[in-house]
């Protein structure tokens, strides 16, 4: 079985080299709208997305993020001109999972319209710092939010990576209730 959605899900890859050209507003808005349609526990729509396109702020965020890597002088945002920080409501028991689903929607939507994207970890660590907390307050973000991830967006400046073969044992199928009973005894 095949369709456009399944093909996009199978072909999207993390992009780690970007052109300096900023993405178009209509592209950004389409990706962000897709993020707002991510499933959330009980439909709470609890995550928050913060869009950063200012070069100075991105450089500051990159330095904060790099401090938690093995290469503190590197650029964990790979030169991407747009960073979407996804935050989770820490008072919502599904908040972090909800934020992860937003990240997935952002990346899949980006691929579907020809943009590169990559999930950059360490958002929680960045915004747990005093500098990160100050930044969030400056943006008007409530104290209850914690970092989930940073979704970098831009036009790829590299060939599209090939998918690795799917590993054996990725899926465990239970076809009948008897098979399930045999497994659990």
Segments predicted by a language model, with ranges:
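Small-aliphatic-rich amphipathic alpha-helix that forms the alpha element of a beta-alpha
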Residues: 35-36, 84, 91-135
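Short, charged/polar surface micro-motifs in flexible loops or helix N-caps
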Residues: 54-59, 90-92, 157
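Active-site-flanking beta-strand signature of metal-NTP-handling nucleotidyl enzymes
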Residues: 83-87, 151
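Short, histidine-centered active-site or binding-site loop motifs used for metal coordination
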Residues: 13, 88-90
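N-terminal amphipathic, basic helical "cap/leader" segment at the start of enzyme domains
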Residues: 1-82
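A glycine-rich helix N-cap at a beta->alpha junction
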Residues: 136-160
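Conserved small/polar residues in nucleotide/adenosyl-binding loops
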Residues: 175-180
């Amino acid at each position: 079985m095949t369709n456009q959605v399944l093909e996009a899900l199978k072909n999207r890859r993390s992009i780690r080299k970007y052109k300096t050209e900023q993405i178009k507003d209509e592209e950004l808005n389409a990706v962000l709208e897709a993020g707002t349609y991510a499933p959330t526990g009980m439909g709470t729509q609890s995550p928050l997305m913060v869009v950063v396109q200012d070069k100075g702020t991105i450089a500051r965020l990159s330095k904060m993020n790099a401090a938690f890597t093995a290469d503190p002088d590197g650029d964990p945002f790979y030169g991407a001109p747009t960073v979407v920080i996804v935050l989770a409501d820490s008072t919502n028991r599904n908040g972090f999972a909800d934020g992860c689903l937003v990240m997935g929607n952002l990346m899949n939507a980006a691929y579907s319209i020809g943009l590169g994207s990559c999930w950059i970890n360490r958002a929680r660590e960045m915004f747990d710092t005093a500098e990160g907390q100050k930044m969030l307050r400056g943006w008007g973000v409530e104290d209850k939010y914690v970092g989930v991830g940073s979704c970098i967006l831009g036009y790829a400046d590299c060939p599209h990576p090939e998918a690795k073969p799917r590993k054996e044992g990725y899926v465990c199928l239970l076809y009948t209730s008897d098979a399930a009973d045999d497994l659990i005894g």
